[in-house]
Regions:
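SAM cofactor-binding core of SAM-dependent methyltransferases
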Residues: 168-233, 244
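N-terminal auxiliary segments of SAM/dcSAM-dependent transferases
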Residues: 1-151
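A short acidic, amphipathic alpha-helical/loop segment
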Residues: 202-203, 252-254, 276-282
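Class I SAM-dependent methyltransferase Rossmann-like catalytic core
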Residues: 2, 89, 93-101, 157-184
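Short, conserved loop/helix-junction motifs that constitute active-site signature segments
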Residues: 206-207, 256, 283-288
Length: 355
């Protein structure tokens, strides 16, 4: 691969690298906050700020979260930029009623039930507790904006716990990140990963969906779903559950073009999902007539973007190792360089095995 840029374009690439560094910095800040103290902000703190500063509730919440993340917006220009360009545009006050009216929430009643170390239960967000509420948003400058939401009141959601760890749940984040795959689904659909059946329920309700095959290898997940959740489905006759490894099924059972759409949800987050995403992307070529969708794909592509940027930067500075594979066409302008880092190209690259 050849990358040959002008001095001006090289400076632009350097500036782009700083943007990607800030993406990682903001992600780290939010990850630490959500892990250590997601309920630090309280109604009393918010009311204190709104009373003193005469700002809206949402503005007060954002200011408190910015301060809790350790950003000094008064004295540090970089911190001020991170607050303005990332956090203030990504924090949202959500309407709990909008989610309570979701068809799954209205139809499915979750009982308290145990399967070995697994427990089907109801968990809660506290008032003003912060949580991830959607996939990251990537703008034209390749800034990646985390989407953080909060409710004014307590919000309950169904979950499966394994001992004390939340294993799966139907929260606003799951609802938002599955909107597009659900909207795309039509004809004969296959879903890799069962979870608590949110995707299955929403897709089965669509008149344009004829059948839904769910591929799941965990017998406990299947048993929990069959006993407590599937009986409440209104269109359960559309659903067939296959206990099998997802990659075996994708390799051996999809080459005939039977499925119109596939949805892949085999991971908990980006850390365990990235290699699985690339593995399934590599199998898409076996099913050219099937449209694939992937849960939290934009976040997975963020990981790939970072990896590719460093590979391209090494090539630009002539520090790439010998035998570097050709993964791109020649790049002679900054615009061509950036195009390789945008999602459309990254989706094509993900399944090639070249990175």
């Amino acid at each position: 691969m050849n990358i040959d840029l002008s001095p001006i374009d090289r400076r632009k690439v350097k500036n782009l690298g700083e943007v990607l560094e800030m993406n990682n910095e903001v992600l780290g800040l939010m990850s630490r906050y959500l892990t250590v103290c997601p309920d630090f902000i309280t109604k009393e703190l918010i009311e204190g700020v709104t009373g003193e500063c005469e700002i809206t509730l949402a503005e007060a919440y954002t200011s408190l979260l910015v301060a809790a993340c350790g950003l000094d917006v008064e004295n540090n220009p970089r911190d001020r930029y991170l607050s303005t360009a990332y956090l203030r545009s990504g924090i949202r006050r959500l309407d709990p009623q909008e989610y309570r009216m979701n068809p799954y929430y209205r139809q499915i009643r979750i009982p308290e039930a145990h399967f070995g170390n697994w427990k089907l239960t109801i968990e809660k967000y506290k008032p003003s507790e912060a949580f991830v509420c959607d996939d990251i948003r990537t703008d034209e400058e390749l800034k990646e904006i985390p989407q953080i939401g909060f409710f004014d009141t307590e919000f309950s959601f169904p979950a499966v716990m394994e001992d004390v760890q939340e294993w799966m749940a139907i929260k606003p984040n799951e609802i938002e990140t599955m909107r597009q795959p659900i909207a795309r689904a039509a004809g004969r659909v296959v879903a890799f990963g069962l979870g608590m059946g949110y995707y299955a329920f929403m897709v089965s309700e669509k008149p344009e969906v004829k059948t839904l095959t769910i591929v799941e290898r965990d017998e406990n997940v299947i048993a929990l779903f069959r006993e407590h959740i599937l009986p409440q489905f209104l269109k359960k006759e559309k659903i067939d559950i296959v206990r099998q490894d997802a990659f075996e099924f994708a390799t051996n059972c999809m080459s005939d073009g039977y499925y119109d759409h596939a949805f892949v949800d085999l991971w908990h987050d980006v850390s365990d999902g990235y290699p699985l995403y690339k593995q399934m992307k590599a199998l898409e070529k076996n099913s050219p007539n099937t449209l694939f969708s992937y849960w939290i794909e934009d976040s997975l592509l963020s990981h790939l973007r970072w990896e590719l940027f460093h590979r391209m930067s090494d090539l630009l500075s002539a520090t790439a190792p010998a035998g570097e594979p050709v993964i791109l066409r020649p790049v002679y302008t900054y615009e061509q360089f950036v195009a390789c880092l945008r999602n459309p190209f990254l989706r094509k690259l993900a399944g090639t095995g070249l990175l």
